[in-house]
Amino acid sequence: MSVSTSVVKSMLQLTNYFGSNFTPKTETISSLAELWERHGSMIASMMSCDTREFGTADKFYEVIFRKIATTSLSFMTDSLEPKLAASGDSLEICKFYALFLEYMRKDHSGMLTRALEQASSENRVDTAVLLDMFLFFDNVYSESTADDWWACLRRDDEDQEASSGFRTPKRNNYSLTSLQTPTATARRLRTASSTARRSPIAEAVDSPTMKFMRSERELKQSKARIFGLEQMLGDLEDDKTKLSAENRTLKLSNSDLKSDIAKLKGIAEEAQFRAEELSCDLEAKKDEVHNILQQLNESRMTLRSEQRSLEEADIKKENLTAKLKTVTEDNGKLMKQARELRDLNDYEFARFRQQEQELTETLRATQDQMADLQEQLTGVEKIRASLKSENESLSASVEELSVASLRNKQDADNSKTMLSEELARFEETVDKLRQEKLEALSMANSRIDALRLEHSEREKMMKSTNARLQADLDEERNEKKRLMNLWNELNEKSLNVDKAVHKSNEEFQSMGSCLQNAKRQIEQLEVACKSKDDIIKFQEEQNKRAANLIKNEKAIRDQASAQFAEKLAILKNSLAEKENETVTLKENFASVVMKHKAELEEKELFLQSRVDLIQRLEHEVADLREKESAEIKKSTWMGERIKIFQQAPMRGSRIRCGSPDSLPDFLADNGPTITEEELRAQLATFPRKSIAPSVDDNEFDKGTPIGFKSNMYDGRESICSLDFFDRSSLQRSSMRSESIQLASPSSAGEFKQPFTPSGVTKERVGVLTARNEKVKPHLKCSYASEVGSTNSPSADEENIKKSKKKNRRDSIFSAFSSKKQ
């Protein structure tokens, strides 16, 4: 069957109405297959689903299925198929939408009612179909069955005809007389609505008197039945009160056991919580050990890196020493060049002196020619002015050279001081780093990075200073070349001056001044050479100091490496101790864990014993219920037997009593050989023994109802029969007030109060032992049962059977038999 078109139409109208009033508004749909895509988020929000965005139809219908399964409509979800609905099956989609509307009717009835009323007033939704569907759901709830709950969605015959087109049925040729329904006889049978078992003929034959007598007889039977039922009701009420009292005691004991179980559960939870805490502590200890090992590995790595960095620093120091050697070699070369320059200056000075002597001789020779050369003085003065300007330029250049040499000296001093400061700073930083590494190994990586950066910067600075020194040396060499060029130029100029002096006597004074200037320049050069010698000496001293510093630094490094090795050995020893401590901690923790496991196992065994005790109590309750049913039977039988013994004469009881323990039967057979006072005196000498039926504790019927004969208990019909009563001391102690008592004359005809032990005490045990020493019990299990020790050897029936049997005690009839003899 397919889905009803009216149902599909009304569902489409309603969902489009919901979509038009929903914020944000959704698009209208023309088929239910588009429901999940356009109205899925709206339906999910109306049903308060967690997921409200759907990429596929499978996800949408799966979410709606889970949501419906958590509501009160979960019993209808067995017939839903999310996969078929996702594939576009109209029946499955209608099922989902119908349950969605039912969910809205249950949880959001006000909103659904307002929407349906407004939609019906606007003629936008056919609400009749939906109301019929809701009525069908109500019928499903009343029938308490969910089979075919979607039957209201299927297409009926009228819908099929409407879908196939209406048409008039063809007229048949049957006559109306041939279609008459057959009827029964005019008179209905009397048994049609009667419940009597007698035949209707017997009812018709009976006379009114017979009917009256039958009704009277039935009335008497019903009265007798009512009377018996009332008596049974009274007995049952008494039994009910007894059982309710026992039930209350059992409930109290059950509540006590539950409280004990709750306490034990709390103890078990505390033990479990303690075990979890210990496991967490173990995990923390493991993490600490792991962290310590990781730190040890990191410290080893940092030590190796530090050793590598120290080796690299040694290599760099060796490079610096090599560079210093090259610098000293360059300084030696410069010293050699300075010596050569000084020798050259001495040679030139000697040559100038020789020239001066020659000039003096020529001066003397030319003094006579001074007058002649006065005219040429003006030209010589001009030449002199030019020479003065040149001398001034030369002096300026010499001053510049001196300033440059001073600057070079200062730069060299600064560079050396910087190198020394950098070496001292480097040593200080190395010492600080060593101390910091020994104090805190965790900061080694950052310090190493800082040292590397600083070392790289220092290398750059050293390279820059070396390059600057090399540039200064190159500049000094260039200046030397320039000075040599200047010296050559001076030589050339001196030669020109000599030529000019030779040419004219007026130029003698100018040449003298030039010589004086040259002398000054030579003196300045000598001073510069001396300063350079001092600089070289200072550099040599600095080199010696640097060598001494390097030696000291090497010694300090050796000492530091030795200290570092000692501290490393100490750290290794401490690490070994820590590892031993961790091993001991692990062993202690394992022992603690095993101890707690044992405690937990003991607690679990204790809880299991409590659970077993509860189960045993439940079994005892079931046994008590069964005993209750047996008690009802026995109470009825006992009531009948008591009535018989109360109403029947002694003769009848004598006929019925077949037990050898029956006292009336014995006296009737043998005659009263002794008087009543003697009998009472004899009975008073014996201890009182209570004999009563243990109806509460025995499940078997010990007697036979009236009118029946038992094959198992022949000859045991007497109420005083010993086999009728159990001889257990606990059962004797649990007898009620209706128990019969054979006692002394003072207590004859009275019921003995039952003994209800409040528990095994020291006094009770003493009383029992004293009694059993005087009169030993018939069964060995009686003492153990009364004391409550089920582990006693006398409580085992097999031990009782295997043990030596005792002689039976003399009964009350032994006295009569002895007197008779």
Swiss-Prot record:
GO terms for molecular function: dynein complex binding. It comes from the Eukaryota. Residues 181-199 have a biased composition (Low complexity). Its main location: cytoplasm. It is found in: Cytoplasm, Cell cortex; Cytoplasm, Cytoskeleton, Spindle; Chromosome, Centromere, Kinetochore; Cytoplasm, Cytoskeleton, Microtubule organizing center, Centrosome. Residues 211-634 form a coiled coil. One of its GO terms (cellular component) is kinetochore microtubule. The keyword Coiled coil applies. Residues 161-199, 736-758, 779-821 are annotated as: Disordered. GO terms for biological process: cell division; establishment of meiotic spindle orientation; establishment of mitotic spindle localization; gonad development; locomotion; mitotic spindle elongation; nervous system development; nuclear migration. Residues 162-180 have a biased composition (Polar residues). Keywords: Cell cycle, Cell division, Centromere, Chromosome, Coiled coil, Cytoplasm, Cytoskeleton, Kinetochore, Mitosis. The keyword Cell division applies. Essential component of the spindle apparatus required for spindle positioning and chromosome movement. Acts to recruit or anchor gpr-1/gpr-2 complex to the spindle and cortex. Also involved, directly or indirectly, in cytokinesis and in the coupling of DNA replication, centrosome duplication and mitotic division. Interacts with gpr-1; gpr-1 forms a complex with gpr-2 and GDP-bound goa-1. This is Spindle apparatus protein lin-5. It comes from Caenorhabditis elegans. The lineage of its organism: Eukaryota, Metazoa, Ecdysozoa, Nematoda, Chromadorea. The gene is lin-5.
